[in-house]
Structures are given as C-alpha cells and as structure tokens.
C-alpha cells in the first residue's frame, strides 16, 4: 500500500430493526468475493428500540497490497471529513451524519 492509496470508506446510518447490520454484512461479503480486503464495525445505539446505529465499512483492493504482503490497518470508527459514502435510511439519519461531520462537500456522496 503506497502512501497515496486509501481505502474506500462507507458509513450506513440506520435505526434499530431496519436491517443495517444485514446490509453491512452483505456489502462486506460482496467486497471480499470481488477481491477486496474489507472490514466493518458498528457503533450501536439502542438498536433493539429503534435507536440510531452507525455501521462503518472500509474496503481496499487486494491487488493494492504491497510487495511484502502487508495489508492495510483499518479504522474502527468513522472520522469527520474522511468518509466517501454515507447511506442513510431516513432523512433524520442523514441530518445526524451531517451534524457529526461525516458528510462533507469535498469528499462524501450522501445517499
């Protein structure tokens, strides 16, 4: 991995019971099948009671691993201004992601 390469960073913002964890698992499995190194973590709210939950995913192409086979070390939590894609299940979740600084006009696509 060169100094200029970086993983693709995606955040899913959902409420408990909306299937955010299932979607995160699908995306990770799909990325791995397509040759990416992938990781997901979650920042659970009160998910069982429709509370806000953030799923954070990072993907890096296996072909980008350096000649020594060192894989990238991924982050455990999204950082403001460093997320490429935010998928929000509801408008209020999109607003929360904007307020947390995870959506920026320079980098982020908000879905």
Residue ranges and their predicted role:
Residues 1-111:
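Active-site cofactor/cluster-binding pocket
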């Amino acid at each position: 991995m060169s100094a200029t390469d970086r993983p693709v960073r995606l955040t899913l913002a959902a409420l408990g019971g909306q299937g955010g964890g299932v979607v995160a698992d699908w995306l990770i499995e799909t990325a791995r099948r397509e040759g990416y190194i992938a990781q997901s973590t979650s920042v659970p709210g009160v998910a069982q009671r429709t509370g806000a939950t953030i799923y954070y995913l990072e993907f890096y192409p296996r072909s980008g691993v350096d000649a020594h086979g060192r894989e990238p070390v991924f982050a455990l939590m999204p950082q403001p201004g460093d997320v490429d894609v935010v998928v929000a299940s509801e408008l209020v979740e999109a607003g929360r992601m904007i307020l947390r600084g995870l959506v920026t006009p320079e980098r982020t696509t908000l879905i």
